[in-house]
Amino acid sequence: MLNLRCALRSAALLRAPAAAAAQSGALPSSGLQPCAGLAIGPQQKQSTFYELRTYNIRPDQTAAFLKLTNEKIHLRTAHSELLGFWNVEYGAMNQVFHIWKYDSYSQRAGVRAAVAQDPSWVSDFLSKAIPMLTSQDNAVAYLVPWCTLRRPPQEGGVFELVSFRMRPGGPAVWGHSFQAALTSHDASGYGKLLGAFHNEYGQLNTVHALWWFENADKRAELRQKAHNDARVVAAVRESVAHLDSQTARLMYACPFSPMK
């Protein structure tokens, strides 16, 4: 019990530096979501949400798909804001992941209708891209209220998307321990947390953490250091008690990605 209290106290002390650090690297107003206290669930008081899309590509068409998207993505971003577009290197093959920002569900519905009626988008991209794909998946997520969306400290580097499937019960059960686990890594310099998201649609009881590292080797080095940090180990130990499973993907930003 004494060890548990110490772990909780250490995790709590780490939250303040993480919040201060978030302020220094915050995105402009178009991408920034304000903190709303220490509630942990989706920011349902905020209408802004993020659509997380995953496309699986035919192995023989990956290069062609990326080339086509690089040339024609401007037709799509004319309708709504793209936050980032990544090519997955580890954790999946022939896969891209992208995040789109919407101010409301009605805005997204309007965008979808406009895109479907955009002849350039349909003929120059969609008709060519769809045959290159094997599947598409999406989720709607909110930033967790204690987190702001941040840019990487510099262009380049690698991005890691870690997705956690939590046990049923919701943020009221596991929210604070999950926050402590993430902020213990971020505040200690074991990675730069760019955003934490909680699914509203798609796989429920799922949260995602988007991280940035200088390169894959640096990420491996920092991970090893984190494993030897008693404060991080204590915070993670409490969080994993509520965890069913998790996956990780290491990604590189595409040339046209706003976040890179």
Describe the function of each predicted region:
Residues 2-260:
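Short S/T/G/P-rich N-terminal loop/turn motif that feeds into the first structured element of a domain
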